[in-house]
């Protein structure tokens, strides 16, 4: 069984058994449930203003949804199922076709939609696909909202629209241009400086929609010398699509053979960004957010946020400017919530996810590229020189499977108690901060697994810390 329902939506491998994999039936059920959820919200708002007996039909006629997808092989099939289901619910559909996750998020705002569905399994292999759900702000639904949507998938009282109330369909192909235009209008994006720098850039777009969006962005920024690796939008990923070191040998080798200034790698839906220096060495995806934040904080003093499993390098940069860094629970929706609470000017996740609220509250590789190129252009520094400004921290990641009978909450409590003499954060699992290192222990939302993240000034120390926590877990379960 691969079908996983979580706070970000539903995902699974294509085909197989209904309810166990991502089948057409599951796509229709989940799309219907999300539509019902949005209709419920609309009706609750409207009921205080109208007592019309035909309220539901009126509400449906006003509903608008944006749909976008990455280039996965199954994407066009899932897209047709999603759009047809929404129309059958009486909802107007704005279909972006091939798009990116941040572009779809932006389109929800720009099209004044009630919500959106992104058809992408992000960095998962090509046999996977997923539906990710957006509210009317172009942000992911909350955990509580996701629970309600899952409950609605089991309802047998859903009413589809009658023939005279079916929703309309519009294919909108300018969403990427709209997104790029909004980025170019940001005060901290300096097109003139980037154009004058005459950068030579190489991209790895993993045969997905980065190949659509990134060349458009770079052209508008005045970058004319661009090489694209894996630029066919056929959904056949040339390598494991997660932008982590073991998957990026191709672009690193290409850079070492030519005179590029910088390389950018994105995942299939373009919400994560990895950077490669002019020497063909990895910038380290944990430092994508760090460098972009450094540039933003130079010009816009303010607070920062990243999740508890992200590098402490962001805190170092934030401290440099006398501002406040706040960690959040893992998950984009949690990062965004904390950013709003603390009025953060920049935030994100250490997996290369940059969230710049001046544009929108969502991870966005396009705005990350625009801000980073501006940083390079205005500082006059090479990519590698920018990376050298920051301390070298090393993160080690481990996981251990648990028997389904294990009380994970109690286990995490025992770990917190064992390390109570140190600084302990219980917002999401247990994070323990030592003098110059930390470890984060948390349970998976979908599997009986404990994940362990440790960071230190050397890889061996980080590995020792993670291994010690693995040993503690085994001991506490005995």
Q: What role is predicted for each listed range?
A:
Residues 133-136, 274-278, 355-357:
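Short beta-strand-to-turn element immediately C-terminal to the catalytic PLP-Schiff-base lysine
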Residues 1-84, 88-89, 168-199:
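An N-terminal, well-structured beta->alpha segment
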Residues 96, 148-181, 185, 277-350, ...:
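Proline/glycine-rich low-complexity loops and linkers
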Residues 67-69, 203-205, 277, 358, ...:
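Short glycine-centered, acidic/aromatic-flanked micro-motifs in structured strand/loop junctions
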Residues 262, 300-478:
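Phosphate-binding and adjacent anionic-ligand microenvironments
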Residues 13, 129-258:
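Gly/Ser/Thr-enriched, mixed-charge loops and adjacent short helices
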Residues 36, 51-56, 61-128, 216-276:
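N-terminal small/polar loop signature for handling phosphorylated ligands or for N-terminal nucleophile
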């Amino acid at each position: 069984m691969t079908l996983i329902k979580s706070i970000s939506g539903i995902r699974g491998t294509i085909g197989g058994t209904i309810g166990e994999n991502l089948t057409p039936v599951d796509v229709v059920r989940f799309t219907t449930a999300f539509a019902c959820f949005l209709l419920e919200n609309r009706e609750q708002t409207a009921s205080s203003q109208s007592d019309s007996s035909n309220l539901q039909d009126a509400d449906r006629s006003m509903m608008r949804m944006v749909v976008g997808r990455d280039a996965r092989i199954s994407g066009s099939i899932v897209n047709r199922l999603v759009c047809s289901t929404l129309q059958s619910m009486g909802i107007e559909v704005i279909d972006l076709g091939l798009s990116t996750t941040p572009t779809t998020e932006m389109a929800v705002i720009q099209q004044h939609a009630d919500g959106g569905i992104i058809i992408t399994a992000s960095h998962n292999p090509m046999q996977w696909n997923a539906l990710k759900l957006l509210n009317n702000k172009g942000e992911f639904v909350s955990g509580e909202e996701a629970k309600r949507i899952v409950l609605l998938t089991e309802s047998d009282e859903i009413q589809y629209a009658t023939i005279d109330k079916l929703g309309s369909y519009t294919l909108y192909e300018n969403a990427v241009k709209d997104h790029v235009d909004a980025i170019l209008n940001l005060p901290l994006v300096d097109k003139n400086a980037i154009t004058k720098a005459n950068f030579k850039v190489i991209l790895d777009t993993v045969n997905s929609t980065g190949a659509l969006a990134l060349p458009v962005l770079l052209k508008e920024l005045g970058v004319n010398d661009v090489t694209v690796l894996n630029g066919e939008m056929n959904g056949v990923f040339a390598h494991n699509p997660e932008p982590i070191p073991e998957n990026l040998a191709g672009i690193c080798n290409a850079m070492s053979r030519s005179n590029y200034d910088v390389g950018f790698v994105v995942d299939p839906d373009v919400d994560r960004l990895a950077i490669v220096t002019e020497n063909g060495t990895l910038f380290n995806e944990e430092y994508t957010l760090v460098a972009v934040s450094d540039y933003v904080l130079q010009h816009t003093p303010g607070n920062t946020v990243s999740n508890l499993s992200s590098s402490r390098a962001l805190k170092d940069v934030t401290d440099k400017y006398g501002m406040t860094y706040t960690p959040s629970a893992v998950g984009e929706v949690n990062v965004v919530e904390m950013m709003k609470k603390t009025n953060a000017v920049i935030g994100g996740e250490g997996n290369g996810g940059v969230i710049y609220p001046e544009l929108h509250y969502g991870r966005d590789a396009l705005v990350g590229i625009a801000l980073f190129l501006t940083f390079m252009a205005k500082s006059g520094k090479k990519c590698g020189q920018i990376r050298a400004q920051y301390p070298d921290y090393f993160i080690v990641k481990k996981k251990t499977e648990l028997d389904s009978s294990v009380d994970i909450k109690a286990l995490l409590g025992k770990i917190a108690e064992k390390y109570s003499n140190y600084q302990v954060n219980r917002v999401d699992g247990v994070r323990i901060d030592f003098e110059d290192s930390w470890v984060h222990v948390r349970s998976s939302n979908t599997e009986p697994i404990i994940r362990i993240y440790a960071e230190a000034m050397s890889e061996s120390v980080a590995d020792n810390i993670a291994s010690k926590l693995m040993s503690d877990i085994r001991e506490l379960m005995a």
